[in-house]
């Protein structure tokens, strides 16, 4: 089924309101296995709406119109659709009764004749009751094309779609997705590595998305059940993870989890919790961002001991008890300083692990290190590890954010290998 969404309202075209209905409907239809091919916005104008309907009829077999069901003269969606289909308008008895109840306790002058328009339907339509408003929606099929009319206010449209429209459109098959998350590889490299799979994709489809510092692959398929979809996903996922990067690293090693709402921080937090480990941190360029991210999770106090924000060399020395001479000798942007910061944070908080971040957020260089140079340390009972990452060509904000992602990834890999 090819679906098309037509939003009716001049206020959308002038930018007075954002068309959130289109996003909601597209997501809802996708979950039902219905593909949305086109989205259109048209003003409150009969001739332009008629021309759009003519175009839509030739390319779509499900046309959903939103907005223009109110009582005023510029609310002309149902009237224009009726004209387009060569049909009359009729009154829905339940909608009329709802109008009667609504105006029963109001002065007589409140119910003007134009209010009756809200109870009208294109002849032959199945009414879609409006649980939160007065304008009734409708659905009808003409010459192989299904037309749906919905109110514009999201507070009215969403309940109508969820409670009335979805049961009528359910076809049995639904759209299922599985999101694979990767860290440590760019989108262009991942797409190049998987180019043959992506070029030849059919079912499931494979869609890459770049996010700040990481890449996701969305696998999508239509199936009658989650079990059927999972069987398809497993085969494709196994093939994806069998590929290697240009550095001969398996994609399975940089794959870290599933889901739209997952994150490296979430994975690291869950591992700390499941292993009963505590963690602390000492941060310089990230200024507490690692610790703040940890604290976002409910129950963080069970694994997060506390930490330090030591932005200057003097504070690194004073708060972490690192000799100032050592810091001056090695520099604040160094593997030595990152290692010492992690070791001292672990010692002072008596935590199982401690992370440190020091580097150059930019835009200027520091100690002959270019912007984006970051050293990350991780201290544990097994010893201290430091890594250097180069986050070039990014804003200060992105450098700090990506540095924190690297820190969580270091925690994740350490816990998995411990």
Swiss-Prot record:
Name of the protein described by the UniProt record: Putative competence-damage inducible protein
SUPFAM superfamilies the UniProt entry points to: CinA-like, Molybdenum cofactor biosynthesis proteins
Species for this entry: Streptococcus gordonii (strain Challis / ATCC 35105 / BCRC 15272 / CH1 / DL1 / V288)
Top-level lineage group: Bacteria
InterPro entries for the chain: CinA, CinA-like_C, CinA_C, CinA_KH, Competence-induced_CinA, MoaB/Mog-like_dom_sf, MoaB/Mog_dom
Family, similarity comment: Belongs to the CinA family.
Originating gene: cinA
Pfam families: CinA, CinA_KH, MoCF_biosynth
């Amino acid at each position: 089924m090819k679906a098309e969404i037509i939003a009716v309202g001049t206020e959308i075209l002038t930018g007075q309101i954002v068309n959130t209905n289109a996003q909601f409907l597209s997501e809802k239809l996708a979950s039902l296995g219905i593909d949305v091919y086109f989205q259109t916005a048209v003003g409150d104008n009969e001739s332009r709406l008629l021309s759009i309907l003519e175009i839509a009829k030739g390319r779509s077999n499900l046309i959903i119109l939103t907005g223009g069901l109110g009582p005023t003269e510029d609310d002309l969606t149902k009237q224009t659709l009726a004209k387009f289909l060569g049909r009359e308008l009729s009154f829905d008895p339940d909608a009329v009764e709802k109008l009667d109840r609504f105006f029963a306790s109001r002065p007589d002058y409140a119910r003007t004749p134009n209010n009756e328009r809200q109870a009208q339907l294109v002849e032959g339509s199945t009414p879609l009751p409006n649980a939160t408003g007065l304008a009734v929606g409708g659905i009808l099929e003409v010459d192989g094309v299904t037309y749906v009319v919905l109110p514009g206010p999201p507070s009215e449209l969403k309940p109508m779609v969820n409670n009335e429209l979805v049961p009528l459109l359910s076809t049995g098959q639904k759209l299922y997705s599985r999101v694979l998350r990767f860290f440590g590889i760019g989108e262009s490299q991942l797409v190049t590595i998987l180019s043959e799979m992506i070029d030849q994709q059919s079912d499931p489809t494979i869609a890459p998305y770049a996010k700040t510092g990481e890449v996701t692959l969305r696998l999508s398929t239509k199936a009658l059940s989650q079990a059927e979809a999972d069987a398809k996903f497993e085969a494709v996922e196994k093939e994806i993870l069998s590929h290697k990067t240009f550095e001969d690293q398996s994609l399975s090693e940089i794959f870290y989890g599933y889901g739209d709402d997952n994150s490296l921080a979430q994975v690291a937090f869950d591992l700390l919790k499941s292993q009963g480990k505590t963690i602390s941190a000492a941060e310089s360029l990230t200024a507490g961002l690692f610790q703040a991210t940890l604290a976002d999770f409910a129950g963080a106090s069970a694994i997060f001991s506390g930490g330090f924000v030591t932005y200057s060399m003097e504070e690194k020395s004073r708060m972490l008890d690192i000799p100032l001479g050592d810091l001056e000798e090695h520099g604040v942007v160094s593997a030595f300083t990152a290692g010492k910061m992690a070791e001292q944070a672990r010692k002072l908080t008596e935590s199982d692990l401690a992370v440190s971040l020091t580097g150059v957020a930019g835009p200027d260089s520091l100690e002959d290190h270019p912007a984006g140079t970051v050293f990350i340390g991780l201290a544990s009972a097994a010893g201290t590890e430091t890594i250097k990452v180069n986050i070039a060509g990014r804003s200060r904000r992105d450098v700090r954010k990506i540095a924190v992602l690297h820190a969580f990834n270091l925690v994740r890999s350490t816990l998995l290998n411990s």
